[in-house]
């Protein structure tokens, strides 16, 4: 399609034959990119409605590169809108990693409803090698920027707006603000095109035509497809034989109660065993947090595990349970970097410093944005076996 897209495809293949190599796209991606012609520049508005994990982000990456190439002479830029600070951080990290080999600069601005001096410097950068081509932020922050005339201040046209989690248009709390933002961009930013990503939206074609106008083509489609199945199971301790006095042995069983397509339904419960390091008797194993820890310890053999609890203080206690000697590992460069940061910020006694040596991370609203971002970073790079979060 264009040189940037061609180079992007080459970088996907050149990663090597590992978990990160990509040799073919998923069926929904193929339909969007090839059959429906998403890479064409004639469509002003596109709504992509696909289930979670169907590859919407990769579709967006191809469309972003096409938009950058289309307005390369004007040094046009793309706004990628995510609804939460955490998702902004996650998207910015991924886009930087993917676009850095292509020379594309990706920046993010905080959701704070002000443009500080650091962001002013970033937005007004005039060096072709350092100026951003993709800006990741929240809808509220972009709304502030548009109302304050930042497209003019930046001096380069806004060429594409990618809206992640676009079903928020239907939200009673945030939908009206997002709708007004898109309407404002549609009327004031003459070069702007739109790509809306959502796992579900009831009026995708209507939204696409609203943004695209009568003289523009539009495309909206939905595909009931996922690359894998999802299993919902219930883990519970089962009392075994008496071992001494009033104490009983135990095991933890996992019963599948729901799968998305009934492909992984299992008639009998799965015995995931016991863990005497976490609980020696049935009464000790009957605590909900202990059951969660035993289950997570068993499942981590298949890959990293996210364990959720309802309150930060319970998150900490659950994370402490997973500090088992069998989980201890020698900290590598990434882990040591995070530990050094935590020591500088919180002191040597901060419990998270020791936890990550066991492959255990913590993530909740009581931690600073920087710490939460570092936990996500370690988890993405496989440095954490467990991420305990609210």
Residue ranges and their predicted role:
Residues 183, 193-319, 361:
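Conserved interdomain linker/interface between the two RecA-like ATPase lobes of SF2 helicase motors
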Residues 34-41, 54-73, 94-96, 180-186:
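Walker A/P-loop NTP-binding motif
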Residues 80-81, 134-138, 160-162, 192-199, ...:
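Structural recognition of the conserved hydrophobic beta-strand(s) that form the central parallel beta-sheet
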């Amino acid at each position: 399609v264009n040189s940037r897209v061609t180079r992007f495809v080459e970088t996907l293949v050149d990663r090597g034959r590992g978990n990160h190599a990509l040799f073919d796209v998923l069926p929904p991606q193929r339909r969007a990119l090839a059959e429906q012609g998403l890479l064409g520049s004639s469509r002003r508005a596109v709504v992509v409605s696909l289930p979670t994990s169907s590859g919407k982000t990769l579709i967006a990456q191809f469309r972003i590169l096409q938009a950058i190439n289309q307005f390369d002479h004007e040094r046009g830029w793309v706004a990628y809108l995510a609804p939460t600070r955490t998702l902004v951080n996650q998207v910015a990290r991924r886009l930087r990693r993917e676009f850095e080999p292509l020379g594309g600069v990706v920046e993010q601005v905080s959701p704070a409803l002000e443009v500080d001096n650091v962001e002013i410097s970033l937005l007004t950068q005039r060096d072709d090698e350092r100026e951003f081509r993709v800006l990741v932020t929240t809808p509220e922050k972009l709304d502030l920027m548009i109302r304050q005339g930042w497209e003019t201040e930046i001096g380069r046209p806004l060429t594409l707006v990618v809206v992640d989690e676009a079903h928020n248009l239907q939200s009673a709390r945030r939908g009206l603000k997002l709708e007004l933002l898109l309407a404002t961009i549609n009327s004031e930013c003459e070069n702007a095109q739109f790509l809306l990503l959502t796992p579900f939206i009831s009026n995708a074609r209507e939204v696409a035509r609203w943004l695209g106008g009568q003289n523009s083509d539009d495309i909206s489609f939905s595909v009931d497809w996922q690359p894998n199945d999802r299993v919902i199971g219930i883990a519970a301790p089962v009392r075994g034989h008496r071992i001494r006095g009033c104490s009983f042995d135990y095991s933890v069983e996992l019963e599948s109660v729901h799968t998305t397509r009934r492909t992984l339904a299992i008639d009998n419960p799965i015995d995931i065993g016991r863990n005497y390091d976490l609980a020696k008797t049935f009464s000790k194993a009957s605590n909900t947090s202990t059951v969660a820890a035993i289950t997570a310890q068993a499942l981590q053999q298949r890959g990293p595990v996210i364990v959720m609890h309802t309150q930060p203080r319970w998150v900490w206690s659950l994370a402490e349970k997973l500090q088992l000697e069998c989980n201890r590992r020698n900290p590598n460069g990434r882990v040591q970097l995070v530990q050094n940061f935590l020591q500088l910020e919180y002191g040597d006694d901060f419990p998270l410093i020791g936890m990550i040596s066991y492959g255990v991370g913590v993530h909740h609203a009581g931690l600073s944005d920087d710490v939460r971002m570092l936990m996500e970073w370690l988890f993405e790079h496989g440095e954490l076996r467990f991420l305990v979060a609210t």
